[in-house]
Amino acid sequence: MLHHYYSGGAGHHQDVAAAGSPGDMASSTFSLFFPMSNGQCWPPSTVEESAAYDDHSTVTTSPSSPSSSSTGSVDCTLSLGTPSSRRAEPVAAAAPAANHGAPVPAHYPSLSAATVSWDATAESYYCGQQGRPATGAAKCAAGAGHDALLDRRCANCGTASTPLWRNGPRGPKSLCNACGIRYKKEERRAAATTTTADGAAGCGFITAQRGRGSTAAKAAPAVTTCGEETSPYVVGGGGGEVANAAYLAWRLNVVPPAATATAFSVWPERASLYHYN
């Protein structure tokens, strides 16, 4: 600091700079802007530590009195550092006290925001948001809150969005709504076909392939039911009149009787053993 004092008889004042090392001047200048609570000056060790984080911003001050005979200016360096250096200053100030006045080693670690792993921060963020798959140790945390519905796809068409999941051949809720309805219809149709085939085989019905162009194929088919057969030539089912009896007799292999002998017909005599007697 610059000390002002008046000489005894001259009546003029002189500015005398206090002699000292550059470190003392920097310490006193730093104490001017950042006074300590107990009134003491800033420790030189703290000034040296803060100088390591200095961003080289300077402030030039002029003498306080305009009538001063001194024409020079004093350059004092202020520690207006970055947030990382501001965080490191309390640690650097507390380190000598913890070491009982011993100098701080050069490799003393400082707390800095730059040392924070952005990968760890990003992994913790994405694990909470479930925006991307996490790797490493964050897989367990991401897998705990993972929803299996997000990875579900239809086994038939491969879609992932459907209003309703239906059961399919690959298990429950393996088909989308449209594919599940189609699969259900085909399953019912196949079951109905199997039931019809089983009923026809139980009655002993055997379908014979008829020859093309044969007369038997042109005949009127009989109405076949399970266990009985009704002829199309019987009118009224059973117990009614028989239509086309001659054709029915021929069908039953019955030969009709011969015509009745007239009165003029002569029956021949039979030859016997007593014919010549």
Curated annotation (Swiss-Prot):
What protein is this chain from?
GATA transcription factor 15
GO BP field: floral organ development; regulation of DNA-templated transcription; regulation of timing of transition from vegetative to reproductive phase
Extract the GO molecular function terms from the UniProt entry: sequence-specific DNA binding; zinc ion binding
Give a Pfam family name: GATA
Keywords for the protein's UniProt record, in alphabetical order: DNA-binding, Flowering, Metal-binding, Transcription, Transcription regulation, Zinc, Zinc-finger
Which CDD domains does the record associate with it?
A: ZnF_GATA
- Matches recorded under PANTHER family: GATA TRANSCRIPTION FACTOR 15, GATA TRANSCRIPTION FACTOR 18
Q: Which family does it belong to?
A: Belongs to the type IV zinc-finger family. Class B subfamily.
Could you say which residues form the signal peptide? none
Zinc finger (GATA-type) boundaries? 154-179
Keyword Acetylation in record: no
Please name the SMART domains in this protein's record: ZnF_GATA
For region Disordered, the annotated ranges are 52-94
